[in-house]
Curated annotation (Swiss-Prot):
Compositional bias per record (Acidic residues), positions renumbered to this chain: 1-18, 26-39
Listed Pfam families: Helicase_C, SNF2-rel_dom
Chain intervals for the UniProt region annotation (Disordered): 1-39, 828-861
Record-annotated Helicase ATP-binding domain positions: 198-371
Primary site of residence: nucleus
Protein name: Protein CHROMATIN REMODELING 25
Binding residues for ATP: D211, D212, M213, G214, L215, G216, K217, T218
Residue ranges of domain Helicase C-terminal in the record: 538-696
Length: 910
């Protein structure tokens, strides 16, 4: 019956019927009397009647089959119709709604309803953000981007078969390729080969981009993401949905970066600082099968809480994990939640893939390509144990050779899907940089408290009884805080926290001048609190010289918010403008602080940064100096923080200072960092040969000797090196010990020798440098033996540090990194000069006061010259009273500070 229906409703039958109707209508006009035509008309009418009755019967029985044919099929056919249907609708007319402004004006023109008895209209929640559509002509103009003549297209894949009709090449869009540097083009190609399966290995579907900070990992990953969202081997996109997981502080930054590079070409949603309902709604919108959203940007914590929403197999085709060292522990809930994704294409971004040990490195590798290195037990037995054993300073030659063989084998495997380039590549695009490790001796108060702590019975009992690790870590934290400033210990004692064990009865060691005479509260001795810490004293002079002599801005980094509080107090007392970013800073406010520091029109000077909260991903190029005030056990944290200023966009010379307290636990922590940095060679295959083999700087036995103090050395790190270069220049050391710092021996550098970055010439000490004070070539950061070794600050290639070191600096390591970009020289800030001139022209009692409450000082009493009068350093007195131009004779005749501690100095004394 269906065949009969099809025959009845065929196009030929319809044509016949139409012709018959036409003939019938012509016959009705009475012009044609031909009998054959009459017979034909009768037959056609009868056939139409039969067909109609038959169709009615089939319609009643439900067996009618209807066939429809398109009108003008050739005219209305669309090439690539499926791809066109996936695009969002755009009005064909050139004068359509091409901006939100027109639509907003039309909506706002409507009269609002005002209820009876009310003077204001009803507030209706309307969407505040409307998607602006663009016309077709404008979209076509944006798609056509011509490459400069000196830039070649980046073809990621090209078909080797001539018979492939769909796609012959996969290439990076010209809007992105014109911004890629050579190493970034290589990185995009490497990631594409891994995630697309072109690598050749069955168990490799992911990769780790382990470039150093500042090499553009974000841009490389965005380029890969956009290419896979648009192209594929069969003509359809290889990736339909992608998830970018990142720390909370970088969610908005990723959204801004994608908008910056590809604009609105990618439909994305970023879940940042949203309510729970908004997060759930956003995730549902993304995971909906027919959703237009292509990319989801989400934090690690948010993904962990809502991981069950992504259980569908089609919810993610590409996973990008930024700051992927967060996945170093495979037992965490975050790691397990991400590992449960069915997505095999995984791209991990981390500038520090090797952080503490090889076990953490295995966790990252196994997450990227599960099973590529076997299970955890096999890795631990076959790779980790021999490599760690061979790196010990006491290892035998056989153990060292076995470690080298296993390291080379591991390197060859992981380098199939790990790409790492050092920041030496940045030298072609950035100004020169110098890294300075500054060893500062502790003050008398710090040394007294330190010795009291390490000799306390509680500490000895805890170490003898093999106390819990948490208790030992508390002792280590207490010593590190003491190295920063005794004020942190004072606050701990007053608060009664557990960290006070070992500091019993220590309040009597603090000077009485630090407390109020009435209430006994801490007052800081009218600014003299700075001099209770060796590192803080050097920092205060460094800030003063920077503010007075240059227009440079500085970033102050610490692991403790209490230390940031001291930085803030110092800036307030000296009236330095500063910004602060720590864990309490909201996500929306962080980028505003960064923008304010990077704005050259703003009068900002110091940026206080918590290494835990803001050490990753921030671009602080508005500052060109950075101080790491205390070391972290994890070298990745310090490296991340130190890389904030030497990044794309930096125009000035960069100075990175690392402060260490001489002979204390801080030097041991830094040695441990260097040992961990040596593990990076496992993933750098070109450095696994015997000639570049390097072991641990700190043995396991040395690590047990954390609670010791060597206050009589210039640098404990340098003492353990047995540096041959410094032994050859021993005569220079003897001259320094005798106080003759200006003697220059026969080992002084020649004028024609290289000064990397021009730092020594800029500081005026190039012709005075000895061989040991110059670095050997371009050493790595962990190769301290090849750095410049300075027993005196006079030879340090940094004029500001020379003027700020004082007696507290005992030793300095320097490493100069070259840069091809000609730096902009620092100048004296005009605002600073005007402020100083204004202060000089004001009476003493009307000048800017150091105290934040800005109250006048008490009247100064005449000087008493009896035996109990304590000598005061003139420079300290001038600093305390905010006037560097007070006449010395005037001070001697009329001023007295009876409660200040006596300080020896080369100046005249009161």
């Amino acid at each position: 019956m269906e065949e009969e229906d099809e025959e009845i409703l065929s196009s030929s039958d319809c044509d016949d019927s139409s012709d018959s109707y036409k003939d019938d209508s012509q016959d009705s006009e009475g012009e044609n009397d031909n009998p054959e035509c009459e017979d034909l008309a009768v037959v056609s009418l009868s056939s139409d009647a039969d067909r109609k009755s038959k169709n009615v019967k089939d319609l009643l029985r439900g067996n009618l089959v209807v066939q429809r044919q398109p009108l003008l099929p050739r005219v209305l056919s669309v090439s690539d119709g499926a791809a066109v249907c996936r695009k969002p609708f755009k009005p064909p007319c050139s004068h359509g709604y091409d901006s939100t402004g027109q639509l907003s004006r039309r909506l706002s023109a409507r009269k609002r309803f005002v209820p009876w008895g009310s003077s204001t209209p009803v507030v209706v929640a309307l969407p505040t953000k409307l998607e602006a559509s663009t016309n077709i002509e404008r979209d076509e103009e944006e798609e056509v981007v011509c490459l400069p003549p000196d830039i070649e297209p980046l073809v990621l894949w090209q078909s080797e078969e001539d018979g492939m009709s769909n796609v012959t090449t996969i290439m990076v869009h010209s809007v992105l390729v014109k911004f890629l540097r050579p190493h970034q083009r290589e990185g995009v190609q490497f990631m594409f080969d891994c995630v697309s399966g072109l690598h050749g290995s069955a168990n490799i579907n992911g990769c780790i981009l382990a470039d150093d900070m500042g090499l553009g990992k974000t841009l490389q990953s965005i380029t890969l993401l956009y290419t896979l969202l648009c192209q594929g081997f069969d003509g359809t996109p290889m990736v339909k949905k992608a998830i970018i997981v990142t720390p909370t502080s970088l969610v908005s930054n990723w959204e801004a970066e994608i908008k910056k590079w590809v604009g609105d070409r990618i439909q994305l949603i970023a879940l940042c600082e949203s309510t729970r309902d908004d997060v759930l709604s956003g995730i549902d919108s993304f995971t909906r099968p027919r959703s237009a959203l292509q990319v989801l940007i989400i934090s690690y914590e948010t993904f962990r809480m809502h991981s069950s929403k992504f259980c569908q197999s089609e919810s993610c085709d590409l996973l990008i994990c930024d700051e992927a060292h967060r996945l170093k522990n495979d037992q965490t809930l975050t790691n397990r939640a991400l590992a449960s994704l069915t997505c095999k294409r995984r791209v991990l971004l981390s500038g520090t893939p090797m952080q503490n040990d090889l076990e953490e490195f295995f966790a990252m590798v196994n997450f990227t390509n599960p099973g590529s290195l076997g299970d955890a037990a096999h890795f631990r037995h076959y790779y980790e144990a021999p490599i760690i054993c061979g790196r010990e300073p006491t290892a035998t030659e056989e153990e060292k050779n076995l470690a080298a063989d296993r390291s080379a084998e591991l390197s060859s495997k992981v380098n199939q899907f790990i790409l790492r380039r050092t920041n030496a590549l940045l030298s072609n695009h950035l100004p020169p940089k110098i890294i300075e490790v500054v060893c500062c001796k502790m003050t008398t108060l710090q040394s007294t408290l330190y010795n009291h702590f390490i000799s306390s019975k509680n500490l000895k009992r805890a170490l003898a009884d093999n106390a819990k690790q948490t208790k030992v870590l508390a002792y280590i934290t207490a010593l590190k805080k003491l190295c920063n400033h005794p004020k942190l210990i004072y606050d701990t004692i007053k608060s009664g926290n557990p960290g006070t064990v070992g500091f019993e009865n220590c309040l009597e060691f603090f000077p009485a001048e630090m407390f109020s005479g009435r209430s006994g509260a801490w007052t800081g001795g009218d600014g003299a609190w700075v001099e209770l810490s060796g590192k803080m004293h050097v920092l205060s002079r460094l800030l003063a010289n920077l503010r007075r002599k240059t227009d440079d801005r500085i970033v102050l980094v610490s692991n403790y918010t209490q230390t940031l509080d001291l930085f803030a107090q110092l800036c307030r007392e000296r009236r330095y403008p500063f910004l602060r970013l720590d864990g309490s800073t909201t996500i929306s406010k962080r980028q505003k602080l960064v923008n304010r520091l990077n704005d050259p029109t703003k009068d900002e000077f110091a940026f206080l940064l918590s290494s835990k909260a803001g050490g990753c991903g921030l671009n602080l190029i508005g500052a060109n100096r950075l101080v790491l005030f205390d070391p972290d056990w994890n070298p990745a944290n310090d490296k991340q923080a130190a890389a904030r200023v030497w990044r794309d966009g930096q125009k000035k010379r960069v100075y990175v200072y690392r402060f260490l307290s001489t002979g204390t636990i801080e030097e041991k922590v830094y040695q441990r960092q260097m040992s961990k940095e040596g593990l990076q060679k496992v993933i750098q295959h070109e450095q696994t040969d015997n000639s570049t083999r390097q072991g641990n700087l700190l043995s396991t036995e040395d690590l047990r000797d954390l609670f010791s103090f060597h206050g009589d050395v210039r640098s404990e790190i340098h003492e353990k090196m047995s540096c041959s270069r410094c032994q050859n220049d021993a005569s220079g050391t003897e001259n320094i010990e005798e106080g003759n710092e200006n003697n220059v021996d026969d080992n002084a550098c020649q004028i024609d020798q290289e000064d990397i970055g021009g730092f020594a010439k800029d500081a005026g000490c190039f012709n005075l440098l000895k061989n040991s004070e110059r670095q050997v070539g371009t050493p790595l950061e962990e190769d301290l033996g090849s750095w410049g070794h300075h027993f005196t600050s006079k030879s340090v290639p940094d004029a500001i540090l020379q003027a700020s070191a004082g007696d507290e600096v005992t030793f300095v390591f320097t490493n100069q990194v070259d840069g091809k970009l000609v730096p902009i020289e620092s100048n004296v800030s005009p605002k600073t000069v005007e402020s100083e001139e204004h202060n000089r022209n004001q009476p003493v009692n009307k000048r800017a006061f150091n105290k934040p409450q800005q109250r006048p000082r008490e009247p100064l009493q005449p000087l008493s010259l009896n035996e109990t009068t304590k000598r005061v350093k003139l420079s300290t007195y001038k600093r305390l009273h905010g006037n560097s131009n007070i006449d010395d004779a005037q001070i001697k005749m009329s001023l007295q500070r009876p409660n200040l501690v006596s300080v020896n100095h080369d100046d005249d004394f009161v």
